């Protein structure tokens, strides 16, 4: 199988040195993406295209090659072709008839020819000769240049003829590795996954940082979607996944910061931490999935206040996107199902968030915050290459859910204190303890290890995530309480 890869159009208008550098990078990426399918793959470059040749004959492997190339940044489109030495017009006609003759009976068709190099004929002369010959010899209904039922396409390059069988769309953008690198703040929801995709599609190597607010299970869920994005759109490059434990940071905010400023303060803490990670990794910008006024922390005044904590460039590729458009894109790229089951935590910590944050006020609220907590979170951050995070998913533990409380078991209400106060959990004959989600991981070890504990929250999401984390920490006496 031979493929002709056409580069993204914006590459073709670059200066000669830049264009050559981008083409070389794209060739390198294609080899990396397809290496496991064909170690002997040949990729050779020309000024405006690359020729990819494989001896692999397995149909499944070929389909996988096509799929991977459609998801490789830097490719405008690519063609499946058969290559022949260039002969005379009769030879060209014979080759086209051999490939398309059985498709033309009773159909309208058009012949399209592109040329590169010096020849004694024009592209139009080739089209006319081949078109009239095919119409005469193949029983075609006629020639229709505007809306043909069949297109007979070919390219002539110097002394070679390429008969084109199929054209596949590319992802566009620039080759990964040709531009700068960024750090994506990844929550695993619709917005952050689509924002990451947009940056990767444009051609920027995108590393991931995750601020863990919800326990081990949430972390694993984000690892899973990060691995998916890397494998599908960025596998040609080495990408890092950094996880920062932020439960203690959230606890500090909840206990010391005014309710209306909790969300803005949390985002500022995330940007502070992300900037430190980006600086350490020598990355050029931060990327978030924020869109104007989608939630309270994303108003222009709030975004302005949030950005003041960092000198690092903050990119927001979705800033003017509608939520439905973001969801549609997530479905298109395959992250929607991940996001649909991935809870967003930023909204659970503030009841009456401000939409008009004032710099002096947020600075006053942050003066109550013990910055040593943020430093500890950064010190405890873990880093691994994203291709290895999937290994950790295999070490996952299942969480048992129960609908009834047995004698001797204790139910722990992990909801936010406001929810506990508004709707107290009262179960007849059952001991209920209140231990908010942001404290459960640090304080669970203080509980009697000989008792059985059932974690409870309204929807079962937070309880499941924290039970999962505790199980992975070695606590076998924890389940999830999900009343019928």
Swiss-Prot record:
Alphabetical list of PANTHER family matching this protein: TRNA SULFURTRANSFERASE
Pathway: Cofactor biosynthesis; thiamine diphosphate biosynthesis
Occurrences of domain THUMP (ranges): 63-167
GO biological process, one term: thiazole biosynthetic process
CDD domains documented for this protein: PPase_ThiI (cd01712), THUMP_ThiI (cd11716)
Domain Rhodanese span(s) in chain numbering: 405-483
Pfam families (alphabetical): ThiI, ThiI_fer, THUMP
The entry's keywords: ATP-binding, Cytoplasm, Disulfide bond, Nucleotide-binding, Redox-active center, RNA-binding, Thiamine biosynthesis, Transferase, tRNA-binding
Family as reported in the entry's similarity comment: Belongs to the ThiI family.
Main location: cytoplasm
GO CC terms in record: cytosol
InterPro entries noted in UniProt: Rhodanese-like_dom (IPR001763), Rhodanese-like_dom_sf (IPR036873), Rossmann-like_a/b/a_fold (IPR014729), ThiI_AANH (IPR020536), ThiI_fer (IPR054173), ThiI_N (IPR049961), THII_Thiazole_biosynth_dom (IPR026340), THUMP_dom (IPR004114)
One Gene Ontology term of the molecular function aspect: CCA tRNA nucleotidyltransferase activity
EC number: 2.8.1.4
Lineage: superkingdom: Bacteria
NCBIfam families attached to this UniProt entry: ThiI_C_thiazole (TIGR04271), tRNA uracil 4-sulfurtransferase ThiI (TIGR00342)
Active site: 457
UniProt function note: Catalyzes the ATP-dependent transfer of a sulfur to tRNA to produce 4-thiouridine in position 8 of tRNAs, which functions as a near-UV photosensor. Also catalyzes the transfer of sulfur to the sulfur carrier protein ThiS, forming ThiS-thiocarboxylate. This is a step in the synthesis of thiazole, in the thiamine biosynthesis pathway. The sulfur is donated as persulfide by IscS.
SUPFAM superfamilies in the cross-refs: Adenine nucleotide alpha hydrolases-like, Rhodanese/Cell cycle control phosphatase, THUMP domain-like
Disulfide bonding pattern of the chain: 346-457
UniProt-recorded name of the protein: tRNA sulfurtransferase
Catalytic activity reported: [ThiI sulfur-carrier protein]-S-sulfanyl-L-cysteine + a uridine in tRNA + 2 reduced [2Fe-2S]-[ferredoxin] + ATP + H(+) = [ThiI sulfur-carrier protein]-L-cysteine + a 4-thiouridine in tRNA + 2 oxidized [2Fe-2S]-[ferredoxin] + AMP + diphosphate; [ThiS sulfur-carrier protein]-C-terminal Gly-Gly-AMP + S-sulfanyl-L-cysteinyl-[cysteine desulfurase] + AH2 = [ThiS sulfur-carrier protein]-C-terminal-Gly-aminoethanethioate + L-cysteinyl-[cysteine desulfurase] + A + AMP + 2 H(+)
Compartments, record wording: Cytoplasm
Binding-site residues for ATP, renumbered to this chain: 185-186, 267, 289, 298
């Amino acid at each position: 199988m031979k493929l002709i890869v056409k580069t993204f159009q914006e590459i073709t208008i670059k200066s000669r040195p830049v264009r050559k550098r981008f083409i070389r990078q794209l060739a390198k990426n294609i080899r990396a993406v397809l290496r496991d399918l064909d170690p002997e793959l040949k990729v050779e470059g020309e000024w405006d295209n690359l020729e990819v040749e494989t001896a692999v004959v397995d149909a499944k492997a070929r389909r996988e090659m096509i799929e991977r190339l459609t998801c490789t940044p830097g490719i405008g489109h690519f063609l499946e072709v058969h290559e022949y030495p260039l002969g005379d017009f009769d030879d060209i006609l014979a080759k086209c008839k051999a490939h398309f003759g059985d498709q033309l009976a009773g159909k309208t068709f058009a012949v399209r020819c592109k040329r590169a190099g010096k020849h004694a004929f024009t592209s139009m002369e080739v089209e006319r000769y081949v078109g009239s010959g095919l119409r005469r010899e193949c029983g075609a209904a006629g020639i229709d240049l505007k809306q043909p039922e069949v297109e007979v396409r070919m390219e002539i390059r110097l002394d070679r003829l390429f008969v084109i069988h199929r054209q596949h769309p590319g992802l566009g953008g620039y080759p990964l590795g040709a531009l700068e690198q960024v750090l994506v703040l990844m929550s695993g929801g619709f917005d952050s996954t689509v924002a990451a995709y947009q940056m990767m599609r444009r051609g920027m190597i995108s590393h991931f940082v995750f601020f863990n607010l919800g326990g081990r299970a949430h972390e694993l869920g984000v690892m899973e979607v990060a691995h998916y994005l890397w494998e599908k759109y960025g596998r040609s490059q080495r990408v890092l996944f950094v996880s920062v434990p932020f439960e203690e940071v959230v606890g500090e905010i909840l206990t010391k910061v005014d309710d209306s400023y909790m969300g803005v303060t949390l985002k500022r803490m995330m940007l502070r931490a992300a900037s430190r990670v980006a600086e350490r990794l020598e990355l050029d910008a931060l990327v978030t999935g924020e869109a104007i006024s989608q939630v309270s922390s994303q108003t222009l005044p709030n975004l302005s206040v949030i950005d003041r904590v960092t000198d690092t460039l903050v990119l927001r590729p979705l800033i003017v996107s509608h939520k439905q458009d973001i969801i549609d894109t997530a479905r298109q790229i395959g992250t929607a199902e991940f996001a649909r089951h991935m809870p967003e935590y930023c909204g659970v910590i503030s009841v009456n968030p401000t939409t008009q944050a004032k710099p002096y006020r947020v600075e006053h609220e942050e003066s109550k915050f013990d910055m040593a907590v943020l430093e500890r979170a950064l010190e405890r951050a873990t880093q691994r290459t994203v291709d290895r995070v999937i290994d950790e998913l295999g070490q996952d533990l299942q969480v048992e859910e129960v609908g009834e409380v047995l004698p001797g078991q204790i139910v722990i209400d992990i909801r936010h204190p406001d929810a506990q106060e508004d709707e107290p959990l009262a179960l007849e004959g059952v001991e209920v303890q209140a231990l908010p989600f942001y404290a459960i991981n640090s304080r669970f070890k203080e509980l009697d290890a000989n008792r059985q504990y059932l974690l409870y929250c309204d929807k079962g999401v937070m309880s499941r995530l924290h039970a999962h984390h505790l199980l992975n920490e070695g606590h076998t006496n924890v389940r999830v309480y999900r009343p019928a």
